[in-house]
Amino acid sequence: MDPTAGSKKEPGGGAATEEGVNRIAVPKPPSIEEFSIVKPISRGAFGKVYLGQKGGKLYAVKVVKKADMINKNMTHQVQAERDALALSKSPFIVHLYYSLQSANNVYLVMEYLIGGDVKSLLHIYGYFDEEMAVKYISEVALALDYLHRHGIIHRDLKPDNMLISNEGHIKLTDFGLSKVTLNRDINMMDILTTPSMAKPRQDYSRTPGQVLSLISSLGFNTPIAEKNQDPANILSACLSETSQLSQGLVCPMSVDQKDTTPYSSKLLKSCLETVASNPGMPVKCLTSNLLQSRKRLATSSASSQSHTFISSVESECHSSPKWEKDCQESDEALGPTMMSWNAVEKLCAKSANAIETKGFNKKDLELALSPIHNSSALPTTGRSCVNLAKKCFSGEVSWEAVELDVNNINMDTDTSQLGFHQSNQWAVDSGGISEEHLGKRSLKRNFELVDSSPCKKIIQNKKTCVEYKHNEMTNCYTNQNTGLTVEVQDLKLSVHKSQQNDCANKENIVNSFTDKQQTPEKLPIPMIAKNLMCELDEDCEKNSKRDYLSSSFLCSDDDRASKNISMNSDSSFPGISIMESPLESQPLDSDRSIKESSFEESNIEDPLIVTPDCQEKTSPKGVENPAVQESNQKMLGPPLEVLKTLASKRNAVAFRSFNSHINASNNSEPSRMNMTSLDAMDISCAYSGSYPMAITPTQKRRSCMPHQQTPNQIKSGTPYRTPKSVRRGVAPVDDGRILGTPDYLAPELLLGRAHGPAVDWWALGVCLFEFLTGIPPFNDETPQQVFQNILKRDIPWPEGEEKLSDNAQSAVEILLTIDDTKRAGMKELKRHPLFSDVDWENLQHQTMPFIPQPDDETDTSYFEARNTAQHLTVSGFSL
């Protein structure tokens, strides 16, 4: 019999071939492509959650970007979350079915709990009566006891992370900040056994594919070996034609390959995705490929055509390269164009001058971006749009990207004005492009679009920098991602700065600020990062024809070191030293070009390109504006209000020590800002997600300006440091960051002391008080005030008619004990009078006070209260 035919037989036959036996012996987990997205549910600090479906069954799919975790030095937390959920088999903990991954993302496929989270329920109720609060706290206490007995500390306990099942019972979720003391990789026996239950329920049985997915490596240190092609060969093929341009890579797809363009694009994409999955050297490996995409889009000659390339840029924008498969199969030729179109549309949303288009349509753009068409066939307006689209993929510094002209496609750096003119033309067309593409978005929704970063309109409305024409930009955003778009912009703005870091080796910040004058009205008050980035952007672009000087973006070599961006000038600009997460930046040699930028920086060009008129609205060089310093100092104040507002919207955060501050320069008084919530990170840090800092750049340039660096910042003579992701040993827990949500942090965490399971019991006490009163006990206007209230144990007990019962107040007291060694635990709660009527053994079988009544099985309305309270408009993002 033909061996091929034998291999197609169902495994299990008596005469099974070798291939059939292998299939039986090594079952495979499902691919993420087998899950279809139904709707978004919510989003948190470190990922987004979607309602997915496979085989008629609904799942909650949490999507976490690997690049985010690498840059935030939190890859171990993703592993900890997966391990904690995989090891947990308790009726009060969310069940994890699969742990899947692509080159760029980790997907945790969990059970979907239709009742929403307790935070949403609390928003609806206002507060819970004592009986209801006791039942919820009792179930959470059982969950914590289970976790602690198995060496797991949740460390992010709050109502947001308590989900309500169909029967109304509580299940803990979101172990993204958990600590697992297993000190080894979990194995099959850990997954198969059920130590928590004498008689394991069928609910906790797992298929071989599920078990394999839960014990598999998450691929942070090794490439994903799931491609049919050898990534090294593909990359070498990509690099084989690099000699035609200095400092650049031309597109390996020529006009003669038009018939295989979609396939070639897939190969190239596969190459980049595979390289992107190896964070051993995330900066070096990933960004060399970004240059390829830049050259394909921006520097190909008219004879070699302009090629659209499915690069890591697209993967970063949408994070799930595989989930576009359905669209590609339905229209193979359109597939690459669609993915590039998404990036173009995203760029359109970020355009500075989003004016309604009349002379350009989707067909023109697709024609221009198609690898088999000559861009010169487009009308002038179309060429301008394509020009900016290409610059979206560009990896060079701002002036090089802006100078590109599709009509004169070359690397001449003397065409900057023409580039600016074309950017303006693109801005004229941007609104129409977004509208034109709405039809294309109507194709089957799938997880390809999952990782587009949404933003909040309320934050967008605060971003009124002059280089953005606010009203038009808002309209363009509305077309793409409703409600959450500004977050992308704000993230970009930090990325904005990271590109300035690429300018760093060529343009000195001191000279930049000295040489240019910025009018006070150009500096928007709410966003520090935006203002700083805008100024740097203008400096770089305005000096495009000048000799490039050196700049100083200093980076850290130590796990606890801070990243400082010192900007000093003769005119007493305040020095700015901003605390940053260690792995947010990978140090680069001062002579390295944009090729060495980070994974996130494939999108850095967006903020630079979409502000072409920034230069036009800037005062002439050399004229020092005395109001600049005042304006900049004003910029350093309001973000505290912004951060305060954000803290009230979303509680999931990763904090640095609250004594982090902005160091003073040698010319001005220090401006101090404590690093606050991850919300601040979301709106002002890098594109990859939310960095644990308020206003840092992602880029990381070693500098030749020692007078601007702090003592522990640079180790001279060491151009690189070993990435933390490849260092052996357990990752340090106390790395200078305070992980958690301000209102629920235990004192020992704030004081930087060693902590254990007691931090969860403290958080449980906070939750009990919040259930009974509707507000956390230490809540205040700013995180710093919250921290002070925690350390002082300043609890505002209700009085009069609202007074809590003595038992309730006593229970809160014993849980909120400053001394963690005297803090109550499970034993103390069981003996406490408040819980005297609780049947601890049969709690999961008791009738709960609230039972969800959804309209249908895909109803997510019970999550809306929290989303609304935290200004998360998730119903339309990623559409």
UniProtKB/Swiss-Prot annotation:
Biological process (GO), any one: regulation of mitotic cell cycle
Residue stretches spanning the membrane: none
S-S pairs: none
One annotated GO molecular function: protein phosphatase 2A binding
Active site annotation, chain numbering: 156
Chain intervals with Polar residues compositional bias: 706-716
Compartments where found: Cytoplasm, Cytoskeleton, Microtubule organizing center, Centrosome; Nucleus; Cleavage furrow
Superkingdom: Eukaryota
Name of the molecule in the record: Serine/threonine-protein kinase greatwall
Organism: Homo sapiens
GN (gene name): MASTL
